């Protein structure tokens, strides 16, 4: 991935389609903008005598603003700033994020001295437990056993629907941030209705994939084929580490199931169409138009027993999921649930699980990998 080196300021756009910006207007704009920025950033320093403001130190006064405003506004910063080790990009926003991170860590460190049982101490203890790899190693899979035992109790498709419903997550945002894929088989987002502005609607969005995108399962690209092989190996290895026999066969079944789910899902481009927000289904529509899933069991376990109306963002994904629940062997679904229970919590399982999860993360993501301390902080927040 190309390194992004962000000086933290926007550049003025060049004139479009040959349009001429009058010099007087440009000069007035630059003077007003520069004066406002200087005033807003330098007042505190001028009052306490600490010397040049942060903004003034980023400026290269040797450059005439009208010739190259970017070089004028950022030249000093670019000369004095180097890219920190392990970072692909660095700018004022990154500096602020790092400053906030250090402050949060300090707060958590202080919270470790709070009275036992207090809210602050519980937060600090959570982070400390995440970092205590020796204790994690000693516990083995004990913390995961209740989840795996719950999967073992699934004896029919109604029980399966309940367990799938329990896994619904509010981790999507189709209208705002364009998040069209949930970690659960379906994601929920409550957003403003497009027809009744004073009302909110319950949006249902596709999910259920272990890889980031449907194309990771369906594309014939050699890189995607290699990624699928890597993912299958992760499934096999985690099931093996957890003590499940026939792990190779189980891994193939899980990958085949996720591939089938992906085939019915919407592409990124199709999912980005806001006309999807106009597809309203009642509870009875799910029963009639997406047979195969016990929707009453699913929604009840998801905590949506009283919700009667939904906006379905990707219709084919819902009907496809229901069809897979109806047709796919129950044991394949149970292996799917077993693997995802293990993978979801791999970072707080013994080192072999965490290492395998990190290896898959490296295969699917670019950029520097977060340290355990960074992952612990993210989990705590």
Which functions belong to the PLM regions below?
Residues 25-38:
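Bacterial N-terminal signal peptides
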Residues 44-46:
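Boundary at the C-terminal end of the N-terminal hydrophobic targeting segment
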